[in-house]
Design a protein with these regions (language model features):
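Short glycine-/acidic-enriched loop or helix-start segments at secondary-structure transitions
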Residues: 51, 72, 120-121, 149-151
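A short beta-strand submotif of the Rossmann-like class I SAM-dependent methyltransferase core
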Residues: 111-112
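S-adenosyl-L-methionine-dependent methyltransferase catalytic module, highlighting the catalytic core
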Residues: 122-130, 137-262
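Histidine-centered divalent metal-coordination motifs
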Residues: 117
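Poly-acidic low-complexity segments
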Residues: 11, 97, 120, 161-162
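Conserved N-terminal segment of class I S-adenosyl-L-methionine
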Residues: 1-104, 108, 252-269
Length: 269
């Protein structure tokens, strides 16, 4: 397991630095972030991503079901919570209370490394559309399932498994046998098998975006993910544009997609 996955304060700082340097500018260049705008992050974890957007002048809400990560966010974002710039909520995003409270409220919604963990991604993206103001934006970043570490195997305690690419593409039965053979924790194995079920490809994501009433405003595919700059001192590299046009093949060499999509008005015909 990489140290960043066990040291949550380090993970928080790395998320903050990466978001401030790469993601805030990615959004701001296409959708000007102004003081008074409100942002919602789904699966906010420890809050490093959300903090970067608040430092850009926004106010925000972070929602996470994971109690341990939520408690860390409360600790790490204490000053922001006290001065009213951030509200943290430890609830299911589908709760009727939040649905009413969040209706057409936000200028921007963020799902950073969250979508690939969600069952029924079509339902979630369509549901979150109702939380956006007219012409509001949603930023999503996720690793396509077929990329070298699309199974999140870097979380494995075995150094060999954490650095070995593509084996998450094995049939489920063989994948499970391999994880057990290296004595991975039962809870981690269950989490990795869940990710195998919730896998998402670039093709399916693009279809969902269109079907759920959004248009793509900006998109960037990365060969070397920006996170690796601070983790491994590797400079980010964008995916070759030609390879990026080839369906299926691009999923095997795209480490992450940055996607900014806009809510479209529904027209009655």
């Amino acid at each position: 397991m990489l140290k960043v996955h066990s040291d949550r304060s380090l993970y928080f700082e790395q998320q903050y630095i990466n978001t401030k340097k790469y993601i805030v500018s990615f959004v701001d260049e296409a959708y000007k972030l102004n003081p008074g705008m409100e942002v919602l992050e789904i699966g906010c974890g420890e809050g490093g991503v959300l903090k970067a957007f608040i430092d850009a002048g926004m106010t925000g809400v972070g929602v996470d079901l994971h109690t341990y990560k939520f408690d860390l966010a409360v600790q790490f974002l204490d000053e922001y919570i006290k001065d009213g710039r951030i509200t943290l909520i430890n609830k299911d995003i589908y709760s009727p209370e939040l649905q009413k409270q969040f209706n057409e409220r936000f200028d921007l919604i963020i799902l950073k490394d969250t979508l690939e963990h969600i069952f029924d991604q079509e339902k979630l993206i369509g549901y979150l559309r109702g939380f956006l103001k007219d012409n509001g934006m949603m930023f999503l970043a996720f690793p396509p399932w077929n990329m070298p570490f699309g199974g999140h195997q870097q979380m494995c305690s075995s150094k060999f498994l954490s650095y070995m690419p593509y084996y998450h593409l094995l049939p489920t039965s063989l994948y499970k046998i391999l994880l057990k053979a290296f004595k991975e924790d039962k809870q981690l194995i269950e989490e990795l098998l869940d990710i195998k079920q919730t896998q998402i490809s670039l093709q399916r994501y693009k279809r969902i975006v269109k079907e759920k009433g959004f248009r793509t405003v900006r998109e960037q595919l990365y060969f070397i993910i920006p996170n690796y700059e601070i983790k491994f001192n590797m400079k980010p590299r964008r995916l070759n544009k030609f390879i990026g046009t080839i369906p299926y093949l691009r999923d095997f060499v795209t480490t992450t997609i940055y996607s900014l999509i806009q809510k479209q008005k529904v027209t009655n015909t």
